[in-house]
Amino acid sequence: MYTLARQLLFKLSPETSHDLSLDLIGAGGRLGLNGLLCKQPAALPVSVMGLNFANPVGLAAGLDKNGAAIDGFAQLGFGFVEIGTVTPRPQPGNPKPRLFRIPEATAIINRMGFNNLGVDNLLARVRASKYSGVLGINIGKNFDTPVERAQDDYLICLEKVYNDASYITVNVSSPNTPGLRSLQFGDSLKQLLDALAERREQLAVSNGKRVPLAIKIAPDMSDEETALVAAALMESGMDAVIATNTTLGREGVEGLPFGGEAGGLSGAPVLEKSTHTVKVLAGELGGKLPIIAAGGITEGRHAAEKIAAGASLVQIYSGFIYKGPALIREAVDAIAAMPR
């Protein structure tokens, strides 16, 4: 059924198709239809960050930026749902067109630019949701906030979403907000992590619960840079790392229609680079910090490869666009079939 739906959706512009799909998934969730229309994955519970996941396959941030279809995505069989990236204030993002399909490579290029309705709008939708599973909220900075003041935006979002999130992801790796990726390095990273850790401990005391913090990183760092990030995450007391965001590289899409568009590349071409980052992180972290792997999962076996590389959980986005809900089940089955 999804194959037919995709054929129809792919006749529309990518962003129109995205918005329509979100509306349909959201409506199906409100009516309780999605679980009836989609075969559910087998139960494969796992505990990570002190949280209990129904299965290790989640929705990556970016697909549902405003929390418009939380119930709908959960009913499709995801073991957890991550929404956002959300910023303190609403912002329109970059000019259109800003989303490009490259079906020949099972890939997508986007330069959306954190378009979202703001953190208060997102929280209203979260509180209206009936979903009781693991919900991640991905936070970022506003486009017009100077990078040297980025910490302020992250702290605003952290405080606002704290009581409504199962875990919180700090996005310092989108390539579509100028200067953002500089926060992954050196003193900038240390200062941000220390500020987040300090505020989180204050919130844990005042709210009576400690919400895990994850950092989402890029796949374009050298092994040495990745190792430095791993050390900083452990030193600051972060709870997880998400590897990875989109890549600025164009391997696998050179010469293809839209392959030269600016923005972050996701989908099949980023698989190898992203999984390599997982392996490097696993070697550096030594099991002290869980890894959530995202990037390039377009077949069930790719999810198993991420787990074998050292990840505890996986997330999908572009693969879901191309393969539909069946990919969730395939990924869960592939992980379940791994030797114990």
Curated annotation (Swiss-Prot):
It is an enzyme of class 1 (oxidoreductase). Binds 1 FMN per subunit. One of its GO terms (cellular component) is cytoplasm. Its cofactor is FMN. Keywords: Cell membrane, Flavoprotein, FMN, Membrane, Oxidoreductase, Pyrimidine biosynthesis. InterPro entries: Aldolase_TIM, DHO_dehydrogenase, Dihydroorotate_DH_1_2, Dihydroorotate_DH_2, Dihydroorotate_DH_cat, Dihydroorotate_DH_CS. FMN binds at residues 61-65, 85, 138, 171, 216, 244, 267, 296, 317-318. GO terms for biological process: 'de novo' pyrimidine nucleobase biosynthetic process; 'de novo' UMP biosynthetic process. It is found in: Cell membrane. The active site is at residue 174. It is a peripheral membrane protein. Pathway: Pyrimidine metabolism; UMP biosynthesis via de novo pathway; orotate from (S)-dihydroorotate (quinone route): step 1/1. Its EC number is 1.3.5.2. GO terms for molecular function: dihydroorotate dehydrogenase (quinone) activity. Its main location: membrane. Substrate binds at residues 65, 110-114, 171, 176, 245-246. It catalyses: (S)-dihydroorotate + a quinone = orotate + a quinol. NCBIfam families: PRK05286.1-1 (NF003644), PRK05286.1-2 (NF003645), PRK05286.1-4 (NF003646), PRK05286.2-5 (NF003652), pyrD_sub2 (TIGR01036). Monomer. Belongs to the dihydroorotate dehydrogenase family. Type 2 subfamily. Catalyzes the conversion of dihydroorotate to orotate with quinone as electron acceptor. This is Dihydroorotate dehydrogenase (quinone). It comes from Pseudomonas entomophila (strain L48). The lineage of its organism: Bacteria, Pseudomonadati, Pseudomonadota, Gammaproteobacteria, Pseudomonadales. The gene is pyrD.
